[in-house]
UniProtKB/Swiss-Prot annotation:
Modified residues (Phosphothreonine): T147
Residue(s) of cross-link: Glycyl lysine isopeptide (Lys-Gly) (interchain with G-Cter in ubiquitin): K149
Organism whose genome encodes this protein: Rattus norvegicus
The protein's name: Cytochrome b-245 light chain
Stated role: Subunit of NADPH oxidase complexes that is required for the NADPH oxidase activity that generates, in various cell types, superoxide from molecular oxygen utilizing NADPH as an electron donor. Subunit of the phagocyte NADPH oxidase complex that mediates the transfer of electrons from cytosolic NADPH to O2 to produce the superoxide anion (O2(-)). In the activated complex, electrons are first transferred from NADPH to flavin adenine dinucleotide (FAD) and subsequently transferred via two heme molecules to molecular oxygen, producing superoxide through an outer-sphere reaction.
Gene: Cyba
GO biological process, alphabetically ordered: cellular response to angiotensin; cellular response to gamma radiation; cellular response to glucose stimulus; cellular response to L-glutamine; cellular response to mechanical stimulus; cellular response to phorbol 13-acetate 12-myristate; cellular response to tumor necrosis factor; cytochrome complex assembly
Length: 192
């Protein structure tokens, strides 16, 4: 049985946490809660988390489905090098970002989700995982002339090669001249 790649789960959890923090922050700020500034903080922290977590990391085995537009944010995340590649750093960062948002009821759900993502990232880091970007594969252009020796001469459906017969010269001349063709099946006018 295969080994679980925890970073993939942490990535999804953290991205959802960022969106939940943004939503809770909007509710707290727009609703003019008593401590609305924690809501404003949650919006900023949620946007930062979403920008960091949007690019998926490459899996060790199998293929990784790239998110729409991920390649643009991947270049930005790659610029920070070991700060974004190391999952210990991400675990601590997410845990620290989640603490201030925990003081407001509207953002407590995002706080709990982000703390869970932090624990999952810590588990991924202990298991030796790290973030690697999904690099685009170079496209191989197929050699058109290399696979087809000679194009087919008969229209489909074609009989198997051993059953096909070569047309005689008289038939070829009649076909090219546009003259009448002989029907090999006898036609009768009997009506039953």
């Amino acid at each position: 049985m295969g080994q679980i790649e925890w970073a993939m789960w942490a990535n999804e959890q953290a991205l959802a946490s960022g969106l939940i923090l943004i939503t809770g922050g909007i509710v707290a700020t727009a609703g003019r809660f008593t401590q609305w500034y924690f809501g404003a903080y949650s919006i900023v922290a949620g946007v930062l988390i979403c920008l960091l977590e949007y690019p998926r990391g490459k899996r060790k085995k199998g293929s990784t489905m790239e998110r729409c537009g991920q390649k643009y944010l991947t270049a930005v995340v790659k610029l920070f090098g070991p700060l974004t590649r190391n999952y210990y750093v991400r675990a601590v960062l997410h845990l620290l970002l989640s603490v201030p948002a925990g003081f407001l009821l509207a953002t407590i759900l995002g706080t709990v989700c982000l703390a869970i993502a932090s624990v999952i990232y810590l588990l991924a880091a202990i298991r030796g995982e790290q973030w690697t970007p999904i690099e685009p594969k170079p496209k191989e252009r197929p050699q058109v002339g290399g696979t087809i020796k000679q194009p087919p001469t008969n229209p489909p459906p074609r009989p198997p090669a051993e059953v096909r017969k070569k047309p005689s010269e008289a038939e070829e001349e009649a076909a090219s001249a546009g003259g009448p063709q002989v029907n090999p099946i006898p036609v009768t006018d009997e009506v039953v």
